[in-house]
Amino acid sequence: MISRRQLLAAMASTPLVSMMGTGSAHALPNNDYKALVCVFLFGGNDGFNMLVPNDNAHYDEYAAARPDIALPQASLLPLSLNTGSDLTLGLHPSMTGIQNLFDSGKMIAIANSGVLIEPSTKAGLQDGTHAMPPFLFSHNSQQTEWQRGWSGSTTPLGWAGRLMDVLSSDTDTISPTFSLNGYAQLLNGSDHSANLIKASSLPKVNAVSNSLRRKSFDQVMSLSPLTAFGREFDRVKDDSISIRDQLATAIESVPEEAHFPDISLSHQLHTVARLIKSSDQLGHQKQIYFVGLGGFDTHANQLDTHTQLLSALSQSLAAFNQSMEASGLGDKVTTMTMSDFGRRLASNGAGTDHGWASNHLVMGGALNSGQLYGQWPSLILDGENDFNKGRMIPTTSVEQIGATIAKWMGVRTDDAMGYIFPNLANFSVQDLGFLK
């Protein structure tokens, strides 16, 4: 039997149409406010063509591993990061917006990260000493593993949902989690379901049309329910309409910003920005958002496709950061990338096949910036970090990244952190230190 929560989630996923005025001024979030924005790069982003070694020795190692798709060294956008060694790094040439964010201290990179159950070595994985995450290299499974944050389990909950189980207030009438990219297990909690919003479904029709639609809808919904299920649906419908109207009103209270480019990810982040700026109306002190960009399964024509995708990512993140900084919210909002997995170092010609570890980005005004986080691997094929055929073994786990963010969001006890990330105890370093 469908639950009340499932009904509410389904109703809340309908396009937002406000029947209320839009002229009220919005209030900025309170001083305790913090938000996490998760950007999922669907398909498996090639993080080693996004963040590339730039010194001669490490670049030669990189180019030897992937001669058909290596970026020209002269094209890389240089980064001034402390790597703890003679390694220097550069960005893909399409990411000038993100280069500027690195230069201004609003962006950091986490090297060679991915899904793990415990710290793992090549030898340990080969002889069974170290546990292998299930269904590696499978899109659906690894998207779930990243979002679940508890590799090896079958829980339907996500780590961000569990985080909000700990942090959200019992008085919240609207869930503090939002997906702008459809269903996301990441946001599933024990106590709440995510609000599903389509950026393209924001109210665009005039007041008369809104009024006529609402009148017709009210007439249909006023019919008396004849069964217990009908009565339950009626209650859920009323809650859902109220939530929908509150969200639409909150979004509409914040003016649109012209600097967001006409890109799908940017549209999603534009809506996120408007919701964040109106969070005080919703009564939230903590919020989590999920957005996504697809197309990263680059088995062919990778150089051209990846250039377009990374340009879209760079432009969208730069616009979102500009919006947060202009509103004085830069240090209250942290944005992170996720992806199914990385790509194999060895190419299949003009593309790459499914890998394991990748490099990831974190953006915001609360960063301890200027250094590389995580451990840069050896890119030698069949070397110590190569599980097989150029699939890099992660040296930093999803749990370590998430726990660092959870601590910044306000998680203070070991019990709470253990509920959110049950595998975290397997890792000696549980706070990577990239947030203040």
Please annotate each region the language model reported.
Residues 2-326, 371-436:
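Feature for exported/extracytoplasmic and membrane-associated proteins, marking the mature portion
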Residues 339-372:
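Histidine-centered active-site microenvironments of extracellular/periplasmic hydrolases
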Residues 286-288, 330, 338, 355-358, ...:
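Active-site lining segments that contact anionic ligands and/or coordinate catalytic metals
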Residues 323-349:
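Metal-dependent active-site segment of extracytoplasmic phospho-/sulfohydrolases and closely related
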